[in-house]
Amino acid sequence: MRSILVVPANSVRMIEKSFTLGSDQIIFDLEDSVILDGKIAARAVLRESLLNSKSAKKLSIRVNEIDSPESLKDLDLISSVGEDILDSIILPKIDSVDRLEQWIKLLPITVEIEVQIETARGLIEAAHLAAHPRVRSLAFGPADFMASVGMPGNSPGTPLPEAATALQYPLFQMIIAAHAFGKLAYDGPYFHFQDSDGLSQATLIAKALGADGKWAIHPNQIDFCNRIFTPSEAEISRAEEIIAAYELSSGAVNLAGLMIDQASLQVAYRLLERTNRSRK
């Protein structure tokens, strides 16, 4: 998925609108987007909307933390909606395989699991989490990660100017962990949704680090994510040239002054895989 739109589960208007937008996936959020007193109503709203939805998009629910009594109520909702409608469940603040296994034992339906890396310990355990056969992807949570490590910022998910690039390190570590086990890796949202230049830069950085897509918190962020994470025609042509040249050789080959080896070949194949995903 290139773009993953996060939608508060308590807004009928936002839920209905999300079905008409261009994101590859929608996450209906029962966790941070909904205050405690509003979670009962949010579950009722979301259940009604999902059961009546005709959307062909990949639909997901982000549940509350497993230590919260709200999580069991979220599971009741998941059971009533069912796996025919839900594509995946988003698990927040997972920091150990034991915590992941707790969730798996409780889940009433068999759906894909996407794990959020939002704490220092979660980052350290990212490879073990990615290795789990039930996990489809890892997603970075910049705001909670900053809180976890005591990183100050002027706004959610945004370090101080003196540490402007600091979050690239944990994001890259998470991407490495995910890709080491053949799983997808997603960057978290850019919170300044009216700052198109900042969003474009953040998305380009995530792509350059190897992320497969990015979360969005506002409709105007979707096209940026889709455009940046969709390989250009020039990139596709170059990848096809690399593959063709390598297949005609018995090893490393010179392509227009550039030495092409096995690593270059794997990068080319991965780009074409991303192209195929974006066209589905």
Report the location of each language-model feature.
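Expand to "…catalyze enediolate/carbanion chemistry for C-C bond making/breaking, isomerization
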Residues: 1-280
